[in-house]
């Protein structure tokens, strides 16, 4: 009986360590994601392909979520006289997936099956309309005045 109790205790400890590791992974992802990223998200609006995107992730202290901005740049003055479409975003890391709500468009996207490092962020993005695309972003240290955009 003592051997069974010991095995049961060890199984419980192993199970608990796995569940805590999952939370730590999400926290680490949110921490690394924090900042500005630029590159090609392969975004299409209408029949126009974005040239590149800039995404800013601002992490809430100690949480797996935050707010930010997502700007898609297009060739020419495509959108209401601008060469970009700007969105405020909210985001959450849950079970290693990154869930993003584009507040100004009222759309949701999910980033999954990705590689995230200090300088490069690549993987797949799935929009709520069923479109799936590979993306590749790089850490951007430029300073942006986010208030200059038409929201």
Residue ranges and their predicted role:
Residues 1-22:
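Sec-dependent bacterial lipoprotein signal peptides
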Residues 32-52, 56:
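Post-signal peptide N-terminal segment of mature Sec-exported envelope proteins
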Residues 82-97, 120, 124-151:
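Edge beta-strand at a domain terminus
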């Amino acid at each position: 009986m003592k051997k069974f109790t010991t095995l049961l205790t060890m199984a419980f400890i192993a199970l608990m360590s796995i569940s805590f590791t999952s939370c730590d992974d999400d926290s680490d992802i949110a921490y690394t994601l924090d900042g500005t990223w630029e590159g090609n998200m392969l975004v299409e609006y209408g029949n126009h392909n974005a040239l590149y995107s800039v995404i800013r992730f601002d992490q809430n202290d100690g949480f797996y979520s935050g707010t930010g901005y997502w700007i898609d740049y297009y060739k020419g003055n495509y959108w209401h006289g601008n060469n970009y479409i700007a969105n405020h975003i909210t985001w959450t890391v849950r079970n290693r997936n990154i869930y993003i709500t584009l507040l100004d468009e009222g759309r949701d996207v999910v980033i999954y099956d990705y590689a995230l490092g200090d300088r490069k962020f690549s993987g797949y993005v799935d929009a709520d309309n069923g479109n799936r695309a590979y993306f590749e972003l790089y850490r951007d240290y430029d300073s942006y005045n986010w208030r200059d955009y038409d929201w």
